[in-house]
Amino acid sequence: MAEIILNVEVRDGAGTGNARATRRAGKVPGVLYGGGKAPVNIAVKANEFRKSLYTGKLLGHLVTLQYGEEKQSVIAKAVQFHPVTDEPVHFDLYRVDEHQLIKIEVPVHFKNHETSVGLKKGGTLEVIRHTVELACPADKIPEELVIDLAGHDIGDVIRISEVKLPEGVKPAMDRDFVIANVKASSAAQSDAGDTTA
């Protein structure tokens, strides 16, 4: 995965007026916090921030923050968007050590839809969790969890215990929760009802 580097500058002042002035200057205001240090108001050039954001690798990934010659590992915790233009208007970054154990949401994706027995029979994939919260070192955050649907039949339940996680990564919750299931569609159920009648 390519490393994302955000070049930031420190903002003077805080509050709504300061944030608006920052946006008028073509930058996105943000706050850097965590790591046992005081919060710092920062800003990133809007085009640079959008480029990093829309790669899909900013949220939930380790990012290098650069201020002059100084570098800091951070995780983007939140990005706020304008309700009409959908442009980023504010972001929060959290300082982390590369090997620090953190909890983070990771997206779930599914593969081999075409080889799933249940889906071939007309079943549907019901996704319960589109993201899963994982506990892992900051430098080992998986980009995604990929779940193989091959061999899953109607009625099968896919739990977190069935997912092979990378070394050093575990679910943040200590229970075997459901991620998805393959269920019979209403059409498949009515076909089954017609054949039994």
Swiss-Prot record:
GO molecular function, one term: structural constituent of ribosome
Swiss-Prot/TrEMBL GO biological process terms: translation
Domain of life: Bacteria
Transmembrane segments: none
One cellular component term from this protein's GO annotations in UniProt: cytosolic large ribosomal subunit
Gene3D superfamilies associated with the record: Ribosomal protein L25, beta domain, Ribosomal Protein L25, Chain P
SUPFAM superfamilies named in the record: Ribosomal protein L25-like (SSF50715)
Keyword rRNA-binding: yes
Keywords, alphabetical: Ribonucleoprotein, Ribosomal protein, RNA-binding, rRNA-binding
Coiled coil: none
Subunit structure: Part of the 50S ribosomal subunit; part of the 5S rRNA/L5/L18/L25 subcomplex. Contacts the 5S rRNA. Binds to the 5S rRNA independently of L5 and L18.
Function: This is one of the proteins that binds to the 5S RNA in the ribosome where it forms part of the central protuberance.
PANTHER family: RIBOSOMAL PROTEIN L25/GLN-TRNA SYNTHETASE, ANTI-CODON-BINDING DOMAIN-CONTAINING PROTEIN, RIBOSOMAL PROTEIN L25_GLN-TRNA SYNTHETASE, ANTI-CODON-BINDING DOMAIN-CONTAINING PROTEIN
Family to which the UniProt record says this protein belongs: Belongs to the bacterial ribosomal protein bL25 family. CTC subfamily.
Entry-linked HAMAP family: Ribosomal_bL25_CTC (MF_01334)
NCBIfam families: bL25_bact_ctc (TIGR00731), PRK05618.1-2 (NF004128)
Protein name: Large ribosomal subunit protein bL25
Higher taxonomy: Bacteria, Pseudomonadati, Pseudomonadota, Alphaproteobacteria, Caulobacterales
Gene (UniProt): rplY
